[in-house]
């Protein structure tokens, strides 16, 4: 099952009032489609996958793939599903999705990225209703949640890590898992932190797993995921909200101290709609 419309149809359907906006839409389309790999000759073949940038960031990348699939699903859901299926087939025995599959076939699997594939699958499915795609992906998504819960969780909340502890490059790899490679957030040791964005992404993950389980008539699973999402949202508001200063931020998972470093990540609880009215007004 595929939802496909041509470039011209998509641009006409989404036509804006200004030339600048229309130019940006066309640039979006041509950039994504210009970075699609051919079906053959790669480790992920026969799936058609998208790279962040041919010649600059070769290979296929974890959450880049999720974002690419969300984007192209607006005009070609088969291509969106190819990207997701092509990348997630490299899931390891613990359930972790790697960070990168390079063009030459090598895999960077010590670390991952925040869990976004459930949300990507939900969005793609809402556009074409392909239940077989959901059936194929659901076990992979469940295994990935298990990886985060078993290997990246302390006292009910998630943290970033890498599988190469003891190596000189370990702390840098943990930063890579966050996607905020050189952020001042990590001037304090990243492995000591409960990151605000990661835990909000995990709430999104639970919500999408709830939706997918319901679509597959897995009622007990759906109930479990929904409960996990509510529990985590409550912990975010309990542990990552600084009531004295009126903001959300990362917190030290060993001491409970909330960081004084404010970044756009602090707005994630508002984005996923778990902040109360008082918190939202304070952050405005």
Give, region by region, the residue ranges found by the protein language model:
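Short amphipathic alpha-helical segments, especially helix-boundary/capping motifs
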Residues: 2-6, 41-46, 57-61, 93-99, ...
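Active/binding-pocket-proximal capping segment
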Residues: 86-91, 230-231, 284
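Intrinsically disordered, low-complexity regions enriched in Ser/Pro/Gly/Gln/His and often acidic
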Residues: 3, 37, 50-56, 141, ...
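Catalytic cores of carbohydrate-active enzymes
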Residues: 2-9, 15, 19-29, 39, ...
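Substrate-binding groove/exosite segments of carbohydrate-active enzymes
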Residues: 14-122, 126, 131-135, 142, ...
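Long hydrophobic alpha-helices with heptad-repeat/coiled-coil character
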Residues: 43-57, 136-158, 276-284
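The feature captures the catalytic groove of carbohydrate-active enzymes
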Residues: 94, 98-116, 122, 131, ...
